[in-house]
UniProtKB/Swiss-Prot annotation:
GO cellular component, one term: nucleoplasm
Tissue specificity annotation: Ubiquitously expressed. Expressed in podocytes.
Cross-link (Glycyl lysine isopeptide (Lys-Gly) (interchain with G-Cter in SUMO2)): 159, 441, 454, 485, 629
Protein name: Zinc fingers and homeoboxes protein 1
Phosphothreonine modification, residue list: 36
Entries under InterPro entries matching the protein: HD, Homeodomain-like_sf, Homez_homeobox_dom, ZHX_Znf_C2H2, Znf_C2H2_sf, Znf_C2H2_type
Entries under PANTHER family matching the protein: ZINC FINGERS AND HOMEOBOXES PROTEIN 1, ZINC-FINGERS AND HOMEOBOXES RELATED
One annotated GO biological process: regulation of transcription by RNA polymerase II
Biased composition (Basic and acidic residues): 212-221
Amino acid sequence: MASRRKSTTPCMVLASEQDPDLELISDLDEGPPVLTPVENTRAESISSDEEVHESVDSDNQQNKKVEGGYECKYCTFQTPDLNMFTFHVDSEHPNVVLNSSYVCVECNFLTKRYDALSEHNLKYHPGEENFKLTMVKRNNQTIFEQTINDLTFDGSFVKEENAEQAESTEVSSSGISISKTPIMKMMKNKVENKRIAVHHNSVEDVPEEKENEIKPDREEIVENPSSSASESNTSTSIVNRIHPSTASTVVTPAAVLPGLAQVITAVSAQQNSNLIPKVLIPVNSIPTYNAALDNNPLLLNTYNKFPYPTMSEITVLSAQAKYTEEQIKIWFSAQRLKHGVSWTPEEVEEARRKQFNGTVHTVPQTITVIPTHISTGSNGLPSILQTCQIVGQPGLVLTQVAGTNTLPVTAPIALTVAGVPSQNNIQKSQVPAAQPTAETKPATAAVPTSQSVKHETALVNPDSFGIRAKKTKEQLAELKVSYLKNQFPHDSEIIRLMKITGLTKGEIKKWFSDTRYNQRNSKSNQCLHLNNDSSTTIIIDSSDETTESPTVGTAQPKQSWNPFPDFTPQKFKEKTAEQLRVLQASFLNSSVLTDEELNRLRAQTKLTRREIDAWFTEKKKSKALKEEKMEIDESNAGSSKEEAGETSPADESGAPKSGSTGKICKKTPEQLHMLKSAFVRTQWPSPEEYDKLAKESGLARTDIVSWFGDTRYAWKNGNLKWYYYYQSANSSSMNGLSSLRKRGRGRPKGRGRGRPRGRPRGSKRINNWDRGPSLIKFKTGTAILKDYYLKHKFLNEQDLDELVNKSHMGYEQVREWFAERQRRSELGIELFEENEEEDEVIDDQEEDEEETDDSDTWEPPRHVKRKLSKSDD
């Protein structure tokens, strides 16, 4: 780091000895009175810890002279020539400010340290906040002159110039504030003013300005520091002081919500990040701030894209910029403070989400507010167009162009903007704000007090208010046509819709998502098992529809919510018999309507695309309802009423009758038994198993597939009462035994029961399908528990759920039953009561009547044999 020269050679000369080119000053003691120090100059030549703009040590901003030469502390460069040394510093270390000084013009106080100037202000200017720093740069020396502005209540300034300065306003009338816009080149032609313009390309060279408080901003003005009486008559400020006056402002908001009055707080901002007004941040509060990052283009571009980087982005930036993550974090925090960016975590997440959805644009939308006394200036200069960047996310910000030379305050303007713009204005909010359609309005209220700063910035994006801009009829028509083709559009389709409809990518995706959600909920609420293909009825979110928007197939406005609002029976009344014949023939050929078939039908029937789509969709809906009704009737024959009520449609009145579909035969009990047995074996049959079931049962393969789908749905909801009984009946079949032999408990494998007398052999096997549901006799709850106890002798908690489901008993009942068996076993009494055994005997006798065997022998059931063995003992 470079340090100040320890030489006593002065670094300034009198202004009278200077030519217009401002050569190096020779003697500080002979300088103008305004720069006369009140302290020991040598004592105050000690470098300060940090400099106000560069946030680097002032100790590093002047180089040390060693043995008649100059040594650079940034590198190993040494030279005895001061000009060569300064050229080296300017070219190799552009961030370094050489030989900076701070002057309080009010007190003629000079110091080399900013800390000393702060202490001076606390001591001699207590409570004063309206300071203005003016930077004066002369070759190798940078002087910051501090003045005090007298700010009045209405935002104007007390006139400080004397009579001679007031007479010279025509000389400075062409000047404009360089804190807002770069100085015009023509300013350099006025040699008599001894003013030069300094163009800064880096953020740190531009003095920082207050943005959110009623404080004067510092203004960067390059001028001769001499304020002697001989030059006071001709030396004037570059920027002409313009007192506030009633002026109309041109307000062109990118989009204003319909019927919404917005109180808009005006704050100053600028599109160019190098010219954005900044909050003055005391460098002492950020000890680890590295000013070298201010010139890093990578960090500047990243900040301009999004001011809140993630940890992963900070890591990448640290690797690319060769700085530590902590330094980058502090730099981003300081930039947000400078630019007045303060978002909540929710706003950050919302802004990041919208940025990746394509709804947040990196180019800020701007609104121009131009006072007429500036825009109609007679000096021929371009008007001052002060743009404002959207500070909030999202937000509408207006700013007023001040005309004073100091621009110390950004007076908030409370504007009430109300209007009902057209739909195109809301959709095309990306268009730059300065449009010919701007409406001229007077500033209704100018409130420069600090209370106005507390007004919240009004938001422009409708999503921030929970309001969605309604889509037009043309937009909805395009979206519906695309939805009919594919419910999950590809990126190419989304891009095409964005070009046609003018909607953003996020809005299109949200519309498709909402439509799928509403359609799915409507199906589940109505319990309709419809054909879910690309031509299914679209259920549109009502928030997207307007009262004038047409539905698919009719131009009548939608009056009330209906799960299928687009299709009603009266749409088919006006079709001729020839049109219906062509449509039905096409539907029987294929229920999926292709584009080629649609064009052919349009040519033959002279119907519109929407009418044909509506007819096909309604046809498929009516067909599905009929099949569903038949399936319900079949389920009623083989299952309980609860199961039938679960799958019955809630409303069938809305489906028009269609005689083109064939009548499906009702399933017989034998067919239902085969299907249920197959369902117990596997809920997802293979294609070969489907073909086998179709061949054995005589049902159509599509009916079997549909039955399995409905049964799986009922099984998932716990509505299959017969499942466990069929499962227990087929358990022995999976071990190699037939389901009919399972009921012969206690019988050896090769032996069977004799058939009852008087019954012909095999007659029951022929007619057993006619018995329907009585084919299988179910065990009682205690019988299932008894079988489990005889097998395991105790209750395993892992099997408790299965026992509860099979026995249809409660958890506590099952536990109490097993506890009772355990107690009986310990006491040595009969484990099972007589009534339980009698019930099982009756059950077994009924089963014996149903089953036949070729064997003429008979053995008693297992439980009877146990009783006999006990009696023998």
